[in-house]
C-alpha cells in the first residue's frame, strides 16, 4: 500500500461531458481559471470543429485533460465491434490532432455498457457523481447540494458543458469554493489516479479512484 502523503490528500476530479463548443465550454474554463483549478473534458466528436477546437486547445493549455465521450453520443452497447472502434477512434484522432496526446479515458454515453465495448475500447471507463445537470429543470442550488453533499475523497464529479447549460456554469462557480472549504484539491482524472497510487485498469467503470468493484 502506498502511504505517501499525497495519497492522503482529499482529491476530486471535475469532469465535463458533451462539449466542445465556443460558449459554455469557454464559460466553464473562465470559472476554472478564476478559481485556479483544472478539470477533465470528455468530448463528443461530432461537436469538434475548427472553432470549438480552439476551446479544446485552451482547456489543454490550462492543464486540463481531454478525454473521449464517443463521436455521436449513441447507445454504444447496441453497436457492432466496428462501430464501437470507429466511435472511439474518431474522437481519439481529433484530440491527438489538437493536443498531440491520445485520450486516456472513455465515458460511455448514457453510462450504457455492453460486452463488445469492453473488448474494443482499450482504456478505462469513467462514470462519476452526477446531479442530473443535463436537465434544465434541475436548479443551480440542487446541482450544488447534490455534488457538495455526495462527494468523497477520490470522487469523479460528472457534469455537462453542453451548449447553453448556464446553470452548470453557475453551479461550478459555487461548487469549487465549497469543496475547497471542505479541504478538497482539484486534479485531472489521470492526476487523481496517480496521486492515489492506483493504476486504473480496463473492464472497469470508475466513479471513484478508490472504488473496489467494477461499478464502484
Model-identified regions with their sequence ranges:
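Catalytic domains of cell-wall/extracellular-matrix polysaccharide-remodeling enzymes
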Residues: 27, 50, 58-61, 71-185, ...
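A generic signature of intrinsically disordered, low-complexity regions enriched in glycine/proline
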Residues: 8, 21-22, 137, 165, ...
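Active-site beta->alpha N-cap acidic-glycine motif
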Residues: 1-77, 83-84, 90, 94, ...
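C-terminal accessory extensions appended to soluble enzyme cores
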Residues: 199-216
Amino acid at each position: 500500500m502506498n502511504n505517501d502523503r499525497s495519497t492522503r490528500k482529499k482529491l476530486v476530479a471535475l469532469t465535463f461531458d458533451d462539449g466542445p463548443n465556443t460558449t459554455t465550454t469557454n464559460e466553464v474554463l473562465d470559472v476554472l481559471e478564476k478559481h485556479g483549478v483544472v478539470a477533465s473534458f470528455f468530448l463528443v466528436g461530432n461537436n469538434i470543429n475548427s472553432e470549438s477546437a480552439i476551446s479544446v486547445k485552451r482547456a489543454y493549455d490550462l492543464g486540463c485533460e481531454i478525454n473521449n465521450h464517443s463521436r455521436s453520443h449513441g447507445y454504444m452497447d447496441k453497436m457492432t465491434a466496428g462501430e464501437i472502434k470507429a466511435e472511439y477512434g474518431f474522437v481519439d484522432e481529433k484530440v491527438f490532432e489538437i493536443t498531440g496526446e491520445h485520450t486516456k479515458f472513455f465515458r460511455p454515453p448514457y453510462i450504457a455498457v455492453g460486452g463488445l465495448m469492453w473488448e474494443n475500447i482499450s482504456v478505462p471507463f469513467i462514470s462519476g457523481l452526477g446531479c442530473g445537470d443535463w436537465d434544465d429543470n434541475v436548479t443551480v442550488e440542487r446541482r450544488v447540494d447534490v455534488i457538495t453533499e455526495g462527494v468523497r475523497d477520490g470522487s469523479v464529479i460528472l457534469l455537462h458543458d453542453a451548449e447553453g447549460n448556464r446553470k452548470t456554469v453557475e453551479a461550478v462557480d459555487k461548487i469549487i469554493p465549497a469543496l475547497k472549504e471542505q479541504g478538497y484539491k482539484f486534479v485531472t482524472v489521470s492526476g487523481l489516479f496517480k496521486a492515489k497510487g492506483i493504476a486504473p485498469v480496463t473492464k472497469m467503470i470508475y466513479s471513484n479512484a478508490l472504488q473496489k468493484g467494477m461499478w464502484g
